[in-house]
Amino acid sequence: MAETEERSLDNFFAKRDKKKKKERSNRAASAAGAAGSAGGSSGAAGAAGGGAGAGTRPGDGGTASAGAAGPGAATKAVTKDEDEWKELEQKEVDYSGLRVQAMQISSEKEEDDNEKRQDPGDNWEEGGGGGGGMEKSSGPWNKTAPVQAPPAPVIVTETPEPAMTSGVYRPPGARLTTTRKTPQGPPEIYSDTQFPSLQSTAKHVESRKDKEMEKSFEVVRHKNRGRDEVSKNQALKLQLDNQYAVLENQKSSHSQYN
């Protein structure tokens, strides 16, 4: 496989080289023809200035130069034709038997109309100064709407909205009661209720409630009085009997059986 690929590549490059050689030879031949035509034209000018004495020879030289100049001029014309760019012309296809022709013509007309609308300067020149402008103004997009008179202002009477009740259930007795709002003034700095302090509690005056509370509770005035009462109660509950007397009785019974 590798050998066949190499052979095909060699053949391809060999053909390419041959084409290049042919092009070079054609160029050399055209250059030689151009040089020959230039020499023939100079020889013809010299024969015309020589006189009538050399009759046949200048004529022969002239014909030879003309013959040499012929192929050179032809090669020049061929090279000029090759150098010039050829514009491709689209061939018009006959759509007479089909419906496609009508569609194509309509699309071409639409394109022309769009171009005219986009280029107002060209239409102005073609229409004699005012044709395109009239066409644009006559379009449906340039129709001016009639000016409408402003409507009379409508007077709206605001109806009082009913008071919105909250969703909280209230008994009928509580519904009629109205909360009295106390006037909120500046805070009293020197009042003990709003700004209590330790000094105000030290100067506390005894009231009737305090006296009643003192009657229900026992006020302790001595530190060791409570402890003495507890120690006396514990001393009364002491058991002075011998707890091991039962064991002595058991020992005596065992000794009797022995």
UniProtKB/Swiss-Prot annotation:
Composition bias type Low complexity, residue spans: 65-74
Q: Where is the composition biased (Basic and acidic residues)?
A: 1-15, 203-231
Q: Where in the cell is it found?
A: Cytoplasm
Is Nucleus included in the keywords of this UniProt record?
no
Q: Which UniProt keywords apply?
A: Acetylation, Cytoplasm, Phosphoprotein
Q: Give the sites modified to Phosphotyrosine.
A: 95, 190, 244
Comp. bias regions, Gly residues: 36-64
State if Zinc-finger is listed as a keyword. Answer: no
Residue numbers carrying Phosphothreonine: 4, 182
> Which top-rank group of organisms is this from?
Eukaryota
Phosphoserine modified-residue sites = 8, 106-107
Where does this chain mainly localize?
A: cytoplasm
Q: Which InterPro entries match?
A: CDV3
Composition bias, kind Polar residues: at what positions?
191-202
The ranges of region (Disordered) come to: 1-234
GO cellular-component term (any): cytosol
Question: N-acetylalanine modification sites?
Answer: 2
Q: In which tissues is it expressed?
A: Expression levels correlate with those of HER-2/neu in breast cancer cells.
Question: Which family is annotated?
Answer: Belongs to the CDV3 family.
Stated name of the protein: Protein CDV3 homolog
**Organism whose genome encodes this protein:** Homo sapiens (Human)
